[in-house]
Amino acid sequence: QTVSLLVLLLAASGFFFSCGNTVNKNAYALEFDSIQVNETVHLFGDTAKPACNLILNFAYASQSSDVRLKDSLNAFFLSACFGDKYMAMTPEEAVKKYTEKYVSDYRNDLEPMYKKDEEDKQDEQSIGAWYSYYKGIESHVQLCNTLILTYRIDYNEYTGGAHGIYMSTFLNLDLKTLSPIHLGDLFEGDYKEALTDLLWKQLMADNNVSTRQELEDMGYATTGDLEPIENFYLDPTGITFYYNVYEIAPYVMGATKITLSYEDIAPLMNGKFIVLSSAIKTDGE
């Protein structure tokens, strides 16, 4: 499954968030909670055979004096975590349906192949290793203030093979418009070339090297170009670009995080970003 971003343009105004799990109680009294699942199901219902394991930790808006606001946020979160077809469901129903589908797909897809392999092969242990599946989707609200909410989704999956795959996605939501915040909303004009240069310089500093070639010799920018991407988050120190495995470096190097300080990117920031960064830095003090 690919974790997708759904752009929701919702008519909502006049609500303000505070840090933590509860927003301004005098406004919409919005609170967040989570639903956990840890489900293991074996092929043919036989505990001696391989199994799939699904772990979910889904963060959602649990309460609000404005029901439409709560439902709109949850539709956004559900779509981002599980897919568009779940966005109209309640969080409880969506998690239940997603779990049922994962288990059903696992058994329907693999039981016929496993049965055939059992008939053709003698070594059951070598068969089982390739049929043990795993998926984890865990989300939480990473940042919340009067202007922005950052929702983080950590995803990992194993479907046989040498290793699994994992990724983290960050959704930055403008709380005044309830729409995603993109780089184009934060930087002035043609910012990409200058921002790319800053990313290279910071990555060199992080790795104690002085040239791009040295970074490439280490493995960076060998699986993809190092450039600004929409997978980023903001905190009191600056903006962090998060490159998942394979995006700019081999799997063995893991994910790459590059943080640019607000001071370094100040010449590129537009007015909205200046206000936003000031609020985030104030909250972090």
Which residues are covered by each model-predicted region?
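Bacterial Sec-dependent N-terminal signal peptides
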Residues: 1-29
